[in-house]
Each structure stands twice: as structure tokens, then as C-alpha cells.
């Protein structure tokens, strides 16, 4: 961890950190990084830190080959049983906890309602709001059972846009 970032944590009392693929080299390195951050943040703030990762499973996996291959949310939704989403959430949660991550930026709670949407697609449990809610809640329960906080995303309606939100501002009419 760069000294400049450690100083930022000390001076600004930063309590939460999000990690990206570029921060991950191996399971052992990630575990050591999370332990270091946990100790530093706890010491400097007196609070337990949240160490975040964006690990949806399916096509969005920051763990990459370090984690298990899991079905996309759309595949889970197509299978028709929210228990599958619970099991995937729990499995991913266990893998995240094993390396020290305690907060997951998942599941996707948006509905995939526009076939021209370049972002949501198979990352959504489907196009029906009730189905997406049921599967998303099951996935989140699986994460929680593994000791990981779930954070549903994206902004409601994103699944009905035609713009990649990483490249431009999506608009829903």
C-alpha cells in the first residue's frame, strides 16, 4: 500500500476501501492486503472497515481465476429457482470472506428491459421486477449468510437505456 494512501487514511480517517482487479495479484496477496487495510483503518478510525469488491459472478468477476466460475444472474433467473441465487451469493460470499473482503457491490437489481442495453444484459436476473426482486433478495441473503454485506445496484431504470454508462449519460424516456 503506497505511503501516500496510508497517510490519506490516517489524516482523513478513511474507513472504507474499494478494491479493483488491478489491486489483485494472488489470493495470498489479496488476503494480506485486506488484513493490512483492516488493521490500519481500525487503528486509525476505531471502526471496523468495509473492504469492497465488485464481484457479481458471471461476466463481472474481479477475482477472476482466483474465484469459482458462477452462472450469470440471467442464467440463475432463467433456471427459475431463487435458491440457486442464494447458493451463488453464499458461495461468492465465502470466497470473498476468505480473502478479507466484507462488502460486495452486488447483486444487480435492475431489470433488463431493453435488448439494446449494452451494460445490464446477462447481469440482470431478468425483465420482471418481482422476479428480479426475489432473486436479488435471495442472492443478498446468501452473501449475508457468508458474512458479507450486499449492495444492490444500479440506478433504477438503467436496464431500459441504450447508452453504456461508463461512456456516457444514459437517459430513460
Regions found by a protein language model. Name each.
Residues 1-15:
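Preference for extracellular/luminal or secreted protein segments
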Residues 12-132, 154, 159-173:
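Enzymes and membrane/adaptor proteins characterized by extended Gly/Ser/Thr/Asp/Glu-rich
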Amino acid at each position: 500500500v503506497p505511503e501516500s494512501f496510508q497517510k490519506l487514511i490516517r489524516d482523513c480517517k478513511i474507513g472504507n476501501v474499494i478494491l479493483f482487479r488491478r489491486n489483485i495479484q494472488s489470493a495470498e496477496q489479496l488476503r494480506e492486503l485486506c488484513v493490512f487495510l483492516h488493521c490500519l483503518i481500525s487503528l486509525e478510525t476505531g471502526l471496523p472497515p468495509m473492504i469492497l469488491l465488485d464481484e457479481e459472478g458471471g461476466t463481472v468477476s474481479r477475482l477472476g481465476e482466483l474465484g469459482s466460475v458462477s452462472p450469470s444472474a440471467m442464467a440463475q433467473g432463467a433456471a427459475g429457482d431463487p435458491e440457486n441465487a442464494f447458493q451463488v451469493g453464499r458461495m461468492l460470499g465465502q470466497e470473498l470472506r476468505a480473502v478479507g473482503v466484507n462488502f460486495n457491490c452486488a447483486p444487480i437489481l435492475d431489470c433488463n428491459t431493453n435488448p439494446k442495453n449494452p451494460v445490464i444484459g446477462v447481469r440482470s436476473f431478468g425483465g420482471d421486477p418481482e422476479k428480479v426482486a426475489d432473486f436479488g433478495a435471495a442472492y443478498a441473503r446468501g452473501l449475508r449468510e457468508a458474512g458479507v454485506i450486499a449492495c444492490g445496484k444500479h440506478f433504477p431504470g438503467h436496464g431500459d437505456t441504450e447508452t453504456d454508462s461508463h461512456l456516457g449519460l444514459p437517459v430513460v424516456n
